[in-house]
Regions:
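Acidic/His/Gly-enriched intrinsically disordered linker/tail segments
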Residues: 112, 116-183
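Active-site recognition of the HExxH zinc-binding catalytic motif
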Residues: 49, 85-101, 112-116, 120
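A broad structural signal for alpha-helix termini and local helix breaks/kinks
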Residues: 53-56, 96, 100, 126-127
Length: 183
């Protein structure tokens, strides 16, 4: 298909090949660069992933532009954009739930929970900094968030701080609502 580009990245020291298939946008080199970065990031993080979560047992993995966000399948992910967070998260589903074979409908925490935990560690490794540091720096300049600032500074474990990112964004947006449960 002339509207799509297919990039292939062989990961050094591994038998894994990364395929990136995306819609070509003439004149938008930033689009090409963003999608090309997926293979480079995969090559950088795979040794860390395999050291911490086990060897990737398949010969290839494909990131395919399509769908409406991110949806993992065996050896492939449909993603709408080249977001590295989504790329890493969906790829880690190859370990949690696919290799473990858990029933993601019956035990969603084993699927999304372990994947999100692993994503936080891999993302932190890739960016080589605490993902919470950005919030700490932002909150230091916002006296209206004193309670949240104290929480960030003294309570949260830095090693797994990325798991709190979505919640902090929600709190800072002013759109937070009370939790509703059936109980």
């Amino acid at each position: 298909d002339p509207d799509y580009r297919h990039l292939v990245k062989k990961i050094a020291g591994s038998n894994t090949i990364i395929h990136t298939i995306y819609k070509f946008k003439p004149g938008k080199t930033s689009n090409d660069e963003a999608w090309a970065k997926i293979g480079d990031v995969a090559a950088e993080v795979l040794p860390f992933i395999e050291k911490n979560f086990g060897k990737y047992p398949y010969p290839q993995y494909s990131f395919i532009q399509g769908g409406d966000g991110g949806m993992e399948y065996p050896m492939a992910t449909l993603i709408h954009t080249s977001s590295l967070g989504t790329v890493i998260h969906e790829w880690l589903h190859s370990w949690y739930q696919m290799m473990l074979g858990t029933n993601e409908s019956l035990y969603p925490w084993m699927d999304e929970g372990f994947t999100s935990y692993a994503e936080d560690l891999v993302t932190k490794f890739y960016y080589k900094r605490s993902s919470l540091q950005e919030y700490r720096d932002t909150l230091k300049n916002r006296p209206d968030n004193k309670t949240l600032k104290e929480l960030v500074e003294h309570v949260l474990p830095e090693d797994h701080s990325g798991a709190y990112n979505s919640y902090f964004r929600l709190v800072q947006s002013g759109q937070e609502e009370a939790l509703t449960t059936h109980s």
